[in-house]
Regions:
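Glycine-rich anion/phosphate-binding loop at the beta-strand->alpha-helix junction
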Residues: 223-226
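Active-site entrance/lid segments in N-terminal catalytic domains of soluble metabolic enzymes
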Residues: 1-220
Length: 226
């Protein structure tokens, strides 16, 4: 057993120090950003705030509302192939493009999950730009190998993978093919992982450490409740 004794911080442990600004109003602030991703070479322009793939949150309706504001959504996994095809292959060009640029398809790592994804990709003529591979434990060897296999089969899809909380596994997933790594185990207000398993990491320290690891490789992270 190894006990880490150095200080780890959660969001509740810190405050943002105010500084002088040349802006006259908060309305003058633009939070839109452009990112180019390491492995897929794709780019994203929008507000870097994401609705997580939670039941009752990341629905089609929410995705359309957020896309209209330049925000991002990772859809829930529960939609059927037919529903997903209808969503991503809308007949209106502007709607279809907005969904392609601001919505991710979410999936697990079972064979059934992969076959479902293939079916949606085929029926939308490759109309999915982002895929979020979401598991409870991002530290398994199988998960890293799955990301590598997915990258080898889909070179230009933006892969979001998680969740992890340490720099070493962040690096591993990026080197295997992930463009964006989801960071966080247990900090969400309704997440029970820490309570039930005793597994987790103070979120601010996790974000700082994982961001440092990712940026050193030209990768990206997303802070997530997990």
């Amino acid at each position: 057993m190894r006990i880490e004794s150095d200080l780890k911080l959660d969001y509740s442990d810190v405050l943002l120090r105010p500084k002088r600004s040349t802006l006259g109003s908060r309305k003058d602030v633009s939070v839109e950003r452009t990112y180019t991703f390491r492995n897929s070479k794709q780019s994203y322009t929008g507000v870097p705030i994401m609705a997580a793939n939670m039941d009752g949150v990341a629905t089609f309706e929410m995705a359309d509302e957020l896309a209209g504001l330049g925000l991002f959504t990772c859809l829930v996994k529960t939609y059927s192939v037919k529903e997903l095809v209808n969503f991503f292959d809308d007949s209106v060009d502007s709607v279809r493009n907005a969904r392609r640029e601001h919505v991710a398809y979410s999936m697990g790592i079972t064979e059934a999950d992969f076959n479902k994804f293939l079916s949606v990709m085929e029926q939308t003529d490759g109309g999915i730009k982002y895929v979020c591979v979401d598991v409870a434990n991002g530290y398994t060897k199988f998960f890293a190998e799955y990301i590598e296999s997915l990258r080898n089969q889909f070179r230009d899809i933006v892969i979001i993978a998680g969740n992890v909380v340490t720099g070493d596994q962040t690096q591993e997933l990026i080197l295997k093919g992930a463009d964006i790594v989801k960071v966080g185990i247990g900090p969400g207000s309704v997440c029970t992982t820490r309570i039930q398993t005793g597994v987790g990491y103070p979120q601010l320290s996790a974000v700082i450490e994982c961001a440092d690891a990712a940026h050193g490789l030209g990768g990206h992270i997303i802070a997530d409740g997990g």
